[in-house]
Amino acid sequence: VSLELGEAAAGAGPGLNEAPEALMQANVDFKQLVEGAGDAIMVCDAMGAITLWNRAAERIFGFGEAEALGQSLDLIIPQRQRQRHWEGYHKTMETGVTRYGADLLRVPALHKDGRTLSIAFTVSMLFSADREVTGIVAIVRDETARFAEERKLRARLVEVEATTIREGDSR
């Protein structure tokens, strides 16, 4: 493909010879951006098959790229969440609109080893040049540790409040 682009650019006039190099550099830059991101970047096609899965997704969910590509999102969606997820997903693919916009969503997810994770993510629709929906991209962060810490802090707050109330009642 690069050779064909080079030949086309060579015959198209001055200044276009740089186009293949610029395109290749943009591709390299994109790959570096995706692979260097600390958050998981996942792309799914209109049917819900995973088409992009970066290193952070591997780290967060435990599935390697080869294990994830081509698979359904059921790979990481807990059983009890699947029906609701797929109803929303298919409606979004049909309409081209996500009801969440740029909202940060928080849901449970599955790790390869069976653990339940707490993840936060945003989604964005993907469209072809003719504005047909081609899929969706999600940027995902593992918030399991933070969520567990918040749970401990809330439990500790309940303990402190209960102790304070008991001490107040005994006076």
What are these regions (language model features)?
Residues 1-6, 17, 132-142:
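PAS-family sensory domains
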Residues 13, 17-20, 24, 31, ...:
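Heptad-repeat register of long alpha-helical coiled-coils used for dimerization/oligomerization
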Residues 17-29, 147-165:
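Sensory-domain boundary/capping and coupling elements
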Residues 24-46, 101, 165:
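Sensory modules in modular signal-transduction proteins
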Residues 30, 53, 61-63:
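Conserved hydrophobic/aromatic "anchor" residues
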Residues 41-42, 50, 171:
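Short hydrophobic secondary-structure edge segments in sensory/regulatory modules of signaling proteins
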Residues 50, 56, 65-69, 74-120, ...:
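PAS/LOV-family and closely related PAS-like sensory domains
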